[in-house]
Amino acid sequence: MRHELIALAISLAIIGNVYPAAGETTLEKVKTSGVLVIGTRTGSPPFAYVNKSNEWVGFSIDLVEKAILPALSKKVDRSVKLEKKESAPATRIPLLTSNAVDLIAETMTDTQSRRESVDFSLTYFVTGAQFLVKKGTPIKGLQSIAGKRIAAQQGSTNARIIREKVPTAKLLEFPDQPAAFQALAQGQVQAYTNDGVQLAGLKAKAPRPDDWVVAGELFSYEPYGMAMRKNDSDFRNLVNVALMDAIESGRYFELYEKWFGAKGEVPYPMSGETKRFLQMQVVPK
C-alpha cells in the first residue's frame, strides 16, 4: 500500500507540472513556468512555416515575439520564453481547451460558432476564400465548381462554405495545407480552396510558381484573430493591448512589409480600407 501511495503521489506531481492548476489563469501559469506556449502552423507561409533553413518562422510568430511576448514579460515581471506546438484547423481548439497551448497564433478565422468554445483577440489580418488551380484549369470561381473535385482543410471555414453554397461539388478534406496542395499537384483534385493570402503563399513557395493561379473573386470574409481560452479576460486584454500598441506604433506595419511587402516572402499589398480597419480597432489609452 505504501508503495502504491508513493506512486500515486509521483503521478499527481507530474500531472501538476504538465497541466495548470484548476482555476489558474494564463498569466498565473506563465508567471510560474516562464513559458508561453502557442499553437501555430508548419506549412502556411508566410504566417507560420518551416523555412529552408529549418527555422519555424512567419508573420504570426513575429507578432507574438515582437509585440505580445515583451508585454507579457513586463506584466509577469520575468523573462518569458516562447514554445511552439503545431496546430491545424481540426486540432487548435482542442489544444487550447486541453491546456496544451495558451494561444493560437496562425490563420484562424474568428467566427460566431468558434466563439462558443474559445475567445478571440482583435482582428489582426483580413482576407477571403479563393481557389488555387493549375494554369489553364477552367475553374474561375465559386460559380464553376459544381461537380468538380475540390480540396479543403478539415475543420476550415472554407470547407463549410463549399458544402453550403455548392453542395454538388465533390469536396475532399485534408488534415493540413501541405496534404491538400499535394493532392492538387498530383491531380487528385481540380482546385484547392483556402484563404487567398494562404494560396498566394503556396504559389510563391511552389517549385514552379508560374504553374499555378489564384482564381476567382473573394467569396468569403475571413477575419483572423488569435484564439485563447474562454473567460480569461486579463490575458485577452494583454494580447489586445499588445496588438493595439503594435498597430499604433507602426511596428505591425513594419512586420507586414517584411512578410507581405513587394520584397517580402509573399507579396500581398494591404488596401487602404484594411489599414483603416486595423487602426480603427485601437481604442484610446
Task: Please describe what each predicted stretch is.
Residues G23-I104:
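Extracytoplasmic small-molecule ligand-binding "clamshell" domains
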Residues V35-T42, V57, L142-G155, K170:
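Short loop->beta-strand "edge-of-pocket" segments that line small-molecule binding or catalytic clefts
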Residues T40-S44, K85-A90, N99-T111, K135, ...:
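Beta->alpha turn/N-cap motifs
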Residues T42, F125-V133, G196, A200-L243, ...:
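Periplasmic-binding protein-like
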Residues I61-P70, Q143, K148-R149, Q154-S156, ...:
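Extended ligand-binding regions for polar small-molecule ligands
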Residues E65, D77-S144, Q281-P284:
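Acidic, polar ligand-binding/catalytic clefts
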Residues K74-A88, A152, A169-Q177, G216:
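Short beta-strand-to-loop elements that line the ligand-binding cleft
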Residues T91, A105-E116, I161-E164, P178, ...:
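A ligand-binding cleft/hinge motif common to bilobed small-molecule-binding domains
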